[in-house]
A protein has these predicted regions:
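GST-like domain detector, emphasizing the conserved glutathione-binding G-site
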Residues: 1-138, 151, 248-249
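C-terminal or late-domain output modules
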Residues: 5-6, 14, 23, 176-185, ...
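Flexible, active-site-adjacent loop/turn segments at secondary-structure boundaries
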Residues: 42-45, 80-81, 155, 178-180, ...
Length: 252
């Protein structure tokens, strides 16, 4: 049995969900509500010690890290392939998969600053401390504490956007001749970068709009049936976030 523990339209969750839909691989969806911190409950941490989504569980064996999960899916379910056959094209696909993974911390910072911080600042101090105490990854713990406290400085956000803008520029250049980053074949590189580019467009539209080649690629990507399925909100796999502040459940 293939089970995917995910949180709907979070960046890394979308990458793996889209891949599975593109390939037509059936899976059992296990939604993890991050806003009620289900990812920090003992049962989830036993599967994923980092306390992040997604986690793929195949016949009882957990696979973590979205990049590793996507490679695993291609290894176990090779058809239809989302990895180019040509070695040079495959290296290009892997490069952009790695870039999407490497730039994620910068994307997380601007997302927290624009979307999450307002909510986190309303959480009482005792709950903030309890949540932070359960977060195993130091960088993520620091990001959460900053978003619930003094927030991110203008320099922090400017630096994150500078990194993101650099990546968007490089990716736009790599899309020629197109239509996809590895040419005619749609690949994991496109899937991984779509989650990054789409989030940048949502938070700062001009970063994509001023790059016509990138904007055209994004429009083509969003027209794919698997993307429309994966990126839709208000669905069983991507329900709307709960309103208000949900208390952290007591540890078992």
């Amino acid at each position: 049995m293939l089970e995917l523990y995910h949180s709907g339209v979070t960046t890394c969750s979308k990458q793996v969900r889209q891949q599975l839909v593109e390939k037509g691989v059936p899976y059992v969806s296990r939604y993890v509500e991050l806003w009620s911190y289900q990812n920090l409950e003992p049962a989830y941490l036993a599967m994923n010690p980092n306390g992040v989504v997604p986690t793929l569980v195949h016949d009882g064996v957990p696979i973590i890290n979205s990049l590793a999960i996507m490679e695993y899916i291609e290894d176990v379910f090779p058809h239809p392939s989302l990895r180019p056959v040509d070695p040079v094209a495959r290296a290009k696909q892997r490069h952009w998969s790695f870039v999407a993974d490497e730039i994620h911390p910068s994307l997380a910072n601007v997302t927290y600053n624009a979307v999450v911080a307002k909510r986190n600042k309303t959480i009482d101090r005792e709950t903030v401390a309890a949540i932070a105490a359960r977060m195993p990854v130091p960088e993520r713990r620091e990001r959460f504490l900053r978003s619930a406290g003094a927030g991110f400085s203008a320099h922090d956000i400017s630096e994150a956007w500078e990194r993101l803008d650099f990546v968007l520029g490089q990716f736009s250049d790599a899309l020629t001749p197109g239509p996809w980053v590895c040419g005619a074949d749609y690949s994991l590189g496109d899937i991984a970068m779509l989650a990054i580019v789409g989030r940048c467009r949502d938070l700062k539209p001009e970063t994509v709009a001023r790059r016509p080649v990138l904007a055209d690629w994004l429009a083509r990507s969003l027209a794919r049936p698997a993307v429309q399925n994966t990126y839709a909100t208000g669905t069983e796999e991507a329900p709307h976030r709960p309103s208000g502040i949900i208390k952290l459940r007591a540890a078992d």
